[in-house]
Amino acid sequence: MEQKLSFELGAQVGADAHFGLIVLQSDQTLEYEFAQVFSKPEWSLHTSRVKSGDEVTVETLAEMENDLTGAAGLFPKSARYDVVGYGCTSGTSVIGAKRIADLVRLGCHTTHVTEPVSALVAACKAMGVKRLAFLSPYIGEVSQTLRQVLVEQGLDITVFGSFQEQLEENVARITPSSMVSASQKLVSKQNVDALFLSCTNLQSFSIVEELEQSLQCPVLSSNLVLAWHMMTLAGMCSHRTDMGSLLREH
């Protein structure tokens, strides 16, 4: 005989902060790196995926606009979020930060929406950064669009370099050692305030401390600034002190 047992309902998982993250279908890195930061038991992090192209072009990036509300709508309907992050740097430069926020809010309940571009601008303001060295994996057209958006936000792209890789599956597998070598060549003898590693598919967390020590300047990445900005908007602080000066000091 089956017994009907009593139960009680508690609060939503994550007593202090509730985060949502929209990850590109082609992204293999963002969730892996976020798991290293959003690991406090008092926080919850829910993820959704948005359809994206295998190749990074202005056209494939623009197409994501059509699917963002649907991706946000795949979060639990009853959940209320402090912050939802959209995980695409170049996509933000093409679609626009305000448009992204509007589309995400149509699909879920959240107090704040952010993405790597707004997060980078906020991080640079917090750190007093104006002159950026910019390392990109993208083809020229995509990189130029993003650089123009950053210049319009008051940042000076002092020096720029790119791997010029169009396939997302290859971007996700660029080795950290390749990034260290490229960063050192790019920043050498340049008068910059910080280095920015652009793209949520780049593996950046493991090399931030090493690069800051060798370059003697702050090192920011798409995943790093997005994580920091999401925590900041929620009124939270990171517990990590081994991922660069942004998380450690701000």
Place the predicted regions along the sequence by residue.
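Short, flexible loop segments at boundaries between secondary-structure elements
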Residues: E165-N170, V219-H239
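N-terminal glycine-rich anion-binding loop in soluble enzyme alpha/beta folds
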Residues: E2-A71, Y138-T175
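Short, well-structured alpha-helical segments in soluble
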Residues: E63-A79, S178-V192
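Glycine/small-residue-rich loop that forms an oxyanion/phosphate-binding "nest" at active or ligand-binding sites
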Residues: A71-T114
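Short, glycine-/small-residue-rich phosphate/pyrophosphate-handling segment
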Residues: A126-V149, A234-H250
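Periplasmic-binding protein-like
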Residues: Y81-G87, A133-L135, V192-C199
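Hydrophobic alpha-helical
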Residues: V180-L211, L226-A227
